[in-house]
Amino acid sequence: MSVHIGAKPGEIAEHILLPGDPLRAKYIAETFLEGAVCYNEVRGMLGFTGTYKGHRISVQGTGMGVPSISIYVNELIQSYGVKTLIRVGTCGAIQPDVRVRDVILAMSASTDSNMNRLIFRGRDYAPTADFHLLRTAYDVGMEKGLALKVGNVFTADMFYNDEPNWETWARYGVLAVEMETAALYTLAAKFDCRALSVLTVSDHIITGEETTAEERQTTFNDMIEVALEAASRNDA
């Protein structure tokens, strides 16, 4: 056991999906994994391990934001030997050509979080996805005919921000805003692991367009399938 994960050694696979919502983890396990078994209920942050097309895969809720995902990623890697981590979550678009329900593969992540500034003593670090995971996920998306976008996302420390300045980030090509990817990529690099964020555009920050519950469910499935295929095809 680690501090926040109650799994025994060997109960967590080397390849894992990371939704923020623990109920989304439960949905993924019940819908996509065979023989899924719950290994964690600590703090209600559910975790499961099963198989996908014969490959052993885990799924673990992480909560929201940089501090929360950092706790789980640290423990998954250091205490349980996880090697491949794929975030599956939502984001808000800030580009006019990025549409609600599109799937974004986060090639890199800008951030206003101070975590990396503390680690690198005030200098800027560029959190970046694993190329092989990114390429595989892109190929899967093309095979499925999905509306994929690949590029930089912005990891925000605040969900409610009175002065977000999205226009500046959009002008520099940032596709969307979320709250975890920069931390995931930084920690994966630190521990020589592979990481990728596969994100569904659930709303458009500039236009105000949103998805319905039914539309979210369908699009989330596309995102989850891309992530599962990327994890299983990179199972070396």
From Swiss-Prot:
<comment type="function">
    <text>Catalyzes the reversible phosphorolytic breakdown of the N-glycosidic bond in the beta-(deoxy)ribonucleoside molecules, with the formation of the corresponding free purine bases and pentose-1-phosphate.</text>
</comment>
<dbReference type="GO" id="GO:0005829">
    <property type="term" value="C:cytosol"/>
</dbReference>
<feature type="binding site">
    <location>
        <position position="43"/>
    </location>
    <ligand>
        <name>phosphate</name>
    </ligand>
</feature>
<feature type="active site" description="Proton donor">
    <location>
        <position position="203"/>
    </location>
</feature>
<feature type="binding site">
    <location>
        <position position="4"/>
    </location>
    <ligand>
        <name>a purine D-ribonucleoside</name>
    </ligand>
</feature>
<dbReference type="GO" id="GO:0004731">
    <property type="term" value="F:purine-nucleoside phosphorylase activity"/>
</dbReference>
<feature type="binding site" description="in other chain">
    <location>
        <begin position="202"/>
        <end position="203"/>
    </location>
    <ligand>
        <name>a purine D-ribonucleoside</name>
    </ligand>
</feature>
<comment type="similarity">
    <text>Belongs to the PNP/UDP phosphorylase family.</text>
</comment>
<protein>
    <recommendedName>
        <fullName>Purine nucleoside phosphorylase DeoD-type</fullName>
        <ecNumber>2.4.2.1</ecNumber>
    </recommendedName>
</protein>
<dbReference type="Pfam" id="PF01048">
    <property type="entry name" value="PNP_UDP_1"/>
</dbReference>
<dbReference type="GO" id="GO:0006152">
    <property type="term" value="P:purine nucleoside catabolic process"/>
</dbReference>
<dbReference type="InterPro" id="IPR035994">
    <property type="entry name" value="Nucleoside_phosphorylase_sf"/>
</dbReference>
<keyword id="KW-0808">Transferase</keyword>
<feature type="binding site" description="in other chain">
    <location>
        <begin position="87"/>
        <end position="90"/>
    </location>
    <ligand>
        <name>phosphate</name>
    </ligand>
</feature>
<dbReference type="InterPro" id="IPR004402">
    <property type="entry name" value="DeoD-type"/>
</dbReference>
<feature type="binding site" description="in other chain">
    <location>
        <begin position="178"/>
        <end position="180"/>
    </location>
    <ligand>
        <name>a purine D-ribonucleoside</name>
    </ligand>
</feature>
<dbReference type="InterPro" id="IPR018016">
    <property type="entry name" value="Nucleoside_phosphorylase_CS"/>
</dbReference>
<dbReference type="InterPro" id="IPR000845">
    <property type="entry name" value="Nucleoside_phosphorylase_d"/>
</dbReference>
<feature type="site" description="Important for catalytic activity">
    <location>
        <position position="216"/>
    </location>
</feature>
<feature type="binding site" description="in other chain">
    <location>
        <position position="20"/>
    </location>
    <ligand>
        <name>phosphate</name>
    </ligand>
</feature>
<feature type="binding site" description="in other chain">
    <location>
        <position position="24"/>
    </location>
    <ligand>
        <name>phosphate</name>
    </ligand>
</feature>
<comment type="subunit">
    <text>Homohexamer; trimer of homodimers.</text>
</comment>
<keyword id="KW-0328">Glycosyltransferase</keyword>
